[in-house]
Design a protein with these regions (language model features):
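Fe(II)/2-oxoglutarate
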Residues: 1, 7-181, 195-199, 402-417, ...
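Residue-level detector of secondary-structure boundary/capping sites
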Residues: 6, 47, 194, 211-213, ...
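A generic N-terminal leader/anchor concept
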Residues: 85-329, 336
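Active-site region of the double-stranded beta-helix
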Residues: 192-194, 235-422, 430-495, 659, ...
Length: 664
């Protein structure tokens, strides 16, 4: 019966008209009817077409003005108590409105949400955020009433979805460049050509304008209350929620939302926060190990307020507090990471915060698989950066086993104290450690002067945005341009051989990149350089790419590639690295497309094709490789790369906007 009613659009329109009746009892009945109709997808679609979300949000705004949020919260607490005593609870009008709105918004498409008037969203969002924060009261846990359950569990998703396409403030990339590297455009050029992904450098001279008016830095430090140690810890730790990670190759924010039903949940240890210190293994050894204050293997969920008290105790005991994903929690940090990502032509930049007490070390001697800019915000910290990086640039999440021992690496490295405002650049693969000065003689109330608070801005070079990734984009772009010629080939088998020769060349590029560092370097084609330096640097980027093409031309090995794909690596995971290529456009019939979404199926079909004639496959591979290396169009590849970059940025910004709204 519900399905039949749901398909009748006039019923939905009639319900929405009745919401404007002006009588509360009628409106309550309508909200209950909307909830019943929303059980089916057809009902939700008809209600959305009837502009029910706009009407519900308008009614919600009228009912709950800013100065009445507290009263709403008090009513919720009262009803929660009544429920806990086993008495029947009359669900409030606000709860009914919210439950209906939440149900419809959370099941709506992005296109539909974009049609909700932006001014209405701006008016309602602060109220929704305030009610959600207050609804996290422990008294409401276990409340069984339908509307409260829908509202409490669905409201974080509603806030996320209404916020994800909002335009938030971002520091212009040029302002970030001047703040971090200096006024002259040549200073950023010098950094890129001399230090980027090569060697560490202290950028203190660029930030000496602390004595002047540095808007970026001042805005950053003013986001923390730094009157005392407790104030700093409170400003950092309170009111945080978990930021479940977004898959690096996920470009549909709705997939993330559908797979994560725990938006707004408490912090998770190891994912959002770590509380750690480095301790010597023994008095005879310089070697240290990391000790966690909490159980590092349990994935503990921290309840509101409880974890902050425990973290303060850990801090007094010498533990460093490390918070991940600060760009999702503080708008000031988000605006900096967006500007920095734009400057370097990357989809996003991460930000972690480290608070270390006096005389302590948080992390042991280690290297990162990403480049970092260490920005000292408060206090001082001593850094040692080794002069012996790893033999090859590490890829993200691919550990390199050979880490130099700290005993052998103390000579010849970079050693310095970072003062407030200083920025230290550390390339990926460069081992380092840091500790604070010992101020144990100072009384507890003065420990703020000895603590260190620094922000690390993480430049993670993801596979699509390294030179290896650009080579894959260039090959894909070239293959798309060849499809008209393939249409003239009458034989299905011959057309498939051409497709699989391109597929194997993608694998060959990956195998070459495993051993050749230039393929692992960040592709800076989309980076923002000062105008009078831009042409020279663009030529340098093109020269890098031509080197890569020459390496592909001379180093591609059919037998090695074929054996790795078909014989030696018979497991399904070997080809998973190429799944990000599914985001690139493909045209034509299915027989001229590569199934990047299911590379194991491609492998199975390749085996069948090779049984019929491996020599033909080998000849086709070398012909494809030669034609690609000699006839690719660099400018077309740049355009496709830029389009892909913007797709990644859009999803990352949606995620960032949504998470920031849950921390506002």
């Amino acid at each position: 019966m519900n399905e039949v009613l749901a398909l009748n659009g006039e019923i939905a329109k009639g319900l929405i008209l009745a919401l404007g009746n002006g009588r509360r009892q009628v409106a309550k009945t309508v909200c209950n009817a909307i909830l019943d109709l929303s059980i089916s997808q057809a009902g939700r679609e008809q209600l959305c077409k009837a502009l029910s979300v706009e009407r519900l949000l308008s009614l919600f705004y009228q009912e709950v003005q800013v100065n009445r949020v507290l009263a709403v919260h008090q009513g919720m607490r009262k009803e929660a108590v009544e429920c806990s005593k086993g008495r029947p609870m009359n669900e409030s009008f606000v709860a009914l409105i919210l439950a209906a709105a939440v149900t419809l918004i959370n099941s709506s498409t992005e296109d539909f949400l974009d049609r909700i008037p932006s001014e209405l969203v701006k008016r309602c969002l602060p109220l929704l955020q305030e009610i959600w924060k207050k609804s996290r009261c422990p008294l409401l846990h276990g409340n069984g009433q339908r509307c409260w359950h829908i509202m409490k569990n669905g409201l974080p998703t509603t806030i996320f979805k209404l916020s994800m396409n909002q335009n938030l403030a971002t520091w212009n990339y040029d302002k970030i460049r001047v703040t971090m590297f200096g006024d002259a455009g040549s200073e950023f050029v010098t950094f890129v050509s001399k230090y980027w992904e090569k060697s560490p450098v202290l950028l203190s001279e660029a930030i000496k304008n602390l004595e002047k008016e540095n808007g970026v830095f001042r805005c950053l430090i003013n986001s923390f209350n730094h009157q005392s140690t407790n104030d700093i810890l409170d400003s950092v730790l309170m009111k945080l929620v978990s930021c479940q990670p977004l898959a690096s190759d996920e470009l549909d924010i709705n997939c993330f939302l559908n797979e994560n039903s725990s938006l707004g949940s408490p912090l998770i240890y190891g994912l959002d926060i770590r509380v750690v210190k480095a301790q010597q293994v023994s008095s005879e050894s310089f070697k240290k190990k990391e000790v966690h204050f909490f159980d590092s293997s349990s994935g503990t969920l921290f309840s509101e307020g409880d974890y902050a008290t425990k973290c303060k105790k850990a801090f007094q005991d010498g533990f460093t507090i490390a918070l991940r994903g600060m760009e999702f929690r503080f708008a000031e940090i988000a605006s900096i990471t967006r500007g920095l990502a734009d400057l370097f032509g990357q989809p996003s930049v991460g930000a972690n915060l480290y608070i270390t007490p006096p005389g302590s070390q948080g992390l042991t001697f280690h290297y990162d698989d990403h480049c970092v800019f260490v920005w000292q915000l408060f206090g001082q910290k001593y850094w040692f950066v080794s002069s012996s990086p790893t033999s090859i640039l590490p890829r993200l999440y691919e550990p390199i086993s050979s880490l130099p021992s700290i005993e052998n690496e103390k000579e010849g490295g970079l050693q310095m104290f970072l003062n407030e405002g200083d920025i230290l650049y550390i390339p990926r693969g460069c081992p380092h450690e840091a500790h604070t000065k010992n101020d144990a003689y100072k009384p507890q109330q003065e420990l703020c002067s000895g603590l260190s608070l620094h922000l690390t801005l993480s430049m993670e070079v993801e596979p699509p945005f390294a030179w290896e990734g650009f080579a894959h984009v260039a090959l894909h772009c070239w293959h798309e341009m060849q499809k008209e010629a393939s249409d003239c080939i009458p034989s299905m088998e011959a057309r498939r051989r051409k497709v699989f020769s391109v597929f194997l060349l993608h694998v060959a590029i990956k195998l070459i990149a495993d051993d050749v560092s230039i393929f692992r370097k960040a592709c800076l084609i989309a980076a923002k350089f000062v105008e009078h330096h831009a042409d020279t640097l663009r030529l340098n980027q093109k020269a890098n790419f031509l080197k890569i093409i020459n390496i592909i031309d001379f180093s591609s090995n059919f037998m090695e590639t074929f054996e790795k794909t078909v014989v030696q690596e018979a497991n399904d995971n070997f080809l998973e690295w190429m799944r990000w290529l599914r985001h690139l456009p493909q045209r034509g019939d299915e027989d001229v497309k590569i199934d990047f979404d299911d590379p194991s199926r491609m492998r199975s079909e390749l085996i069948e094709l090779s049984i019929k004639g491996n020599e033909e496959m080998k000849d086709e591979f070398f012909q494809t490789k030669s034609r690609f290396c000699r006839s690719l169009v660099y400018e077309e590849a740049c355009r496709m790369f830029q389009v892909m970059l913007e797709k990644y940025r859009r999803t990352r910004n949606q995620y960032m906007n949504g998470m920031l709204a849950l921390h506002t």
